[in-house]
C-alpha cells in the first residue's frame, strides 16, 4: 500500500461545457516571477480552473494514452529485480474476486472468512519497510533506461514515483508545504525525487503518534487478509510489485511513473488498490481529502480500481468490503449535494485538481528548463507552500542522472 487553503470567491464559468484548454496556462501579468540567478519565486495562487461548484457526470482522466510499459518485482532481502514476470503479481484471493464481480456484499462465504477480523492483530510484531526503500530510485532509473528510446524527444517527460505526483496534485487541498528535488537531464527530461532535508516520518513510520501508526497498520493487515498467501518459490514476504506507466499530460509533457501495486484481480486483469477506512462522512474534511487522494492515485493508472475494507472505528474489526471504480469515487466527492455547500480547499473538486495538475506541470517544465544547464544534469529544490507559491532554487543534495 502506497503511503502521504483557500476559501475565496470563485468566478463562475460562463458555460459548463467550456473547453478546459482555455483555462490551462495563466497569462496574467500580475503573476510575474521574482527571479535571482538560478532561482525563481512565482505565485500560483490564481491558477486557472473551473468553478469549485463545477459538476460533470463523467470523471476526467488525468493522463491520456496511458499504458503499462513494464512491471517489476523487487525482492528486498537480496535486492533482486525481476522484470516483466506476470506470474509474480500479488493476486487477490479467488473468493474476493468473485465477491467483487457479483457485487453480493452479503455473500456468506466472504462474511464468514473476513468480516469481524481485528485489523490491529499483529501490530506489535510488525516491522515496516525502511523509508529509503519506498523512495528508492533504483527501479525507476532502470525502467527509464529500458524505455528511454521510445520516449518522444519533442516532449519533456517527468520521471517519478507515483506518490510524488500525487503530492504535487494535492497541494491546493492541503494546509502543509511540499518540498521535492527535480533534476533536469541533458535530454530535457526531469526526474522527481524525495527532498531528504524535508522528508518527515509519517503514517506507519511516524514515531510520536502510536495511534496513527496502528491505524495505518490496518491497511497492511487488510492486504495480508485479502491477497493469496505466499507459496514457496513464488511471492516472498518482503517482495514489492511495481507497475511502470507512461502517459501524456498534454502536447508538451509526458509522465513515466513507478507505482507500487497492492494486488491484481485475476478475473478482470485489473490492479486493485486495497484501502482500510472507517465509514466515510462526506462532511468531514479529512474524509473528503482522503477520497480525492484515492481518486488521483487510481486515475494515474490505465486499469485500476479500489477495494475498501470499512472497519469499526472503536474495535477496528472489519465490518464491510466494498469495491469502487474510479467513477464511483469521483461521484462521491463531485455531486451537486456536496459542492453546493460552503467549503475550503476548493471543495476538494477533482476537476479543479485536474486543472491544477495541468497548470503546475506546465509551469514547472517551462521554468526548470529555463534555469537548467544545457550540457549537464541540474538538480533544483522545488517547494510549494500553503499559498501555492512556487520556489525553485539550486539544490545542495546531489541526485545521480537517469542515464
Swiss-Prot record:
Cofactor binding notes: Divalent metal cation.
Record's keyword terms, sorted: Cytoplasm, Exonuclease, Hydrolase, Metal-binding, Nuclease, Nucleotide-binding, RNA-binding
Cofactor annotation: a divalent metal cation
Transmembrane segments: none
Broad EC category: hydrolase
UniProt-listed InterPro entries: RAI1, RAI1-like_fam
Binding site for a divalent metal cation: 223, 262, 273-274
Reactions that this protein is recorded to catalyse: a 5'-end NAD(+)-phospho-ribonucleoside in mRNA + H2O = a 5'-end phospho-ribonucleoside in mRNA + NAD(+) + H(+); a 5'-end (N(7)-methyl 5'-triphosphoguanosine)-ribonucleoside-ribonucleotide in mRNA + H2O = a (N(7)-methyl 5'-triphosphoguanosine)-nucleoside + a 5'-end phospho-ribonucleoside in mRNA + H(+)
EC number(s) given by UniProt: 3.6.1.-, 3.1.13.-
Principal cellular location given in the protein's record: cytoplasm
Pfam families: RAI1
A GO cellular-component term linked to this record: nucleus
Keyword Hydrolase: yes
Subcellular location: Cytoplasm
Alphabetical GO biological process terms: NAD-cap decapping; nuclear mRNA surveillance; nucleic acid metabolic process
Record keyword Metal-binding present: yes
Binding site for substrate: 260, 275, 297
GO molecular function: 5'-3' exonuclease activity; metal ion binding; mRNA 5'-diphosphatase activity; nucleotide binding; RNA binding; RNA NAD+-cap (NAD+-forming) hydrolase activity
Family from the record: Belongs to the DXO/Dom3Z family.
Biological function: Decapping enzyme for NAD-capped RNAs: specifically hydrolyzes the nicotinamide adenine dinucleotide (NAD) cap from a subset of RNAs by removing the entire NAD moiety from the 5'-end of an NAD-capped RNA. The NAD-cap is present at the 5'-end of some RNAs and snoRNAs. In contrast to the canonical 5'-end N7 methylguanosine (m7G) cap, the NAD cap promotes mRNA decay. Also acts as a non-canonical decapping enzyme that removes the entire cap structure of m7G capped or incompletely capped RNAs and mediates their subsequent degradation. Has decapping and 5'-3' exonuclease activities.
Protein name: Decapping and exoribonuclease protein 1
